[in-house]
């Protein structure tokens, strides 16, 4: 029993010496820190030591109350703490040695480490999902990786949006082309319909004109006889009334006044009638004998004025109405 107690005691002292040696090795192997960051590193070390030494104080108080069994428990409880400190020492030393190699490794494996969750354990100390502590350089690299990942995601988002926009534009262009084709088709159909309608109307007009021409050709003889008889009535009316208003003649034959004047002039040129149209819109019919009598009076007197001609004309010309017999008329020349 005494030997066992001695072995436990020796093992406890050895554990303490190993712990002190590990701490010394940790501080000796730690790289030099610039003077500007000394205070910050000291504060971080003090906080880390306080967190690590807190369970040791509680554990060291237990042997005084529990005896040999307490020392065995103390050794068993210290062992994980020592192992954790050894791992921390190795990780801190490997961070500075592998900084150059990790740069190339990070560039070649851009996707690696993107999913790591980073959390702050203490000021200046960061841990990932696995619980391992991460140095400042590693943290900066992880942040850089995260920024690159976000940049890649943003570029991918832009590409997807551009692709989506291009597809929408292409669909809109297709719809526009289809609409233009449909409008062109409708326009051609409308033009064809208008052309057919126009041809139909032209055919109808042609057929109507053709039928009218046929009717006119069939009624030429009748129209010639009617015009001849109407012309004879016109001449008879002028001879009977002797003095006629042009408006009365137009009303009588259902024609315009201008047509009456033109017809009188035409008949005068043809020698069918003779007379004058005064400035008051009257036509005075004068026979050839009466005109010859007036001409003889002028030739006999030589120089005469208008009053003398008027007086002699009233004496020589008979202005009373006469009934003209159709048999006594001169033959009418329709040519």
Swiss-Prot record:
Compositional bias ranges of the Acidic residues kind: 104-117
Lumenal topological intervals: 1-6
Alphabetized SUPFAM superfamilies for the sequence: Winged helix' DNA-binding domain (SSF46785)
Keyword Cell membrane in annotation: no
Cell compartment(s), UniProt: Endoplasmic reticulum membrane
Function: Substrate adapter for ufmylation, the covalent attachment of the ubiquitin-like modifier UFM1 to substrate proteins.
UniProt protein name: DDRGK domain-containing protein 1
Annotated organism of origin: Dictyostelium discoideum
Origin organism lineage: Eukaryota, Amoebozoa, Evosea, Eumycetozoa, Dictyostelia
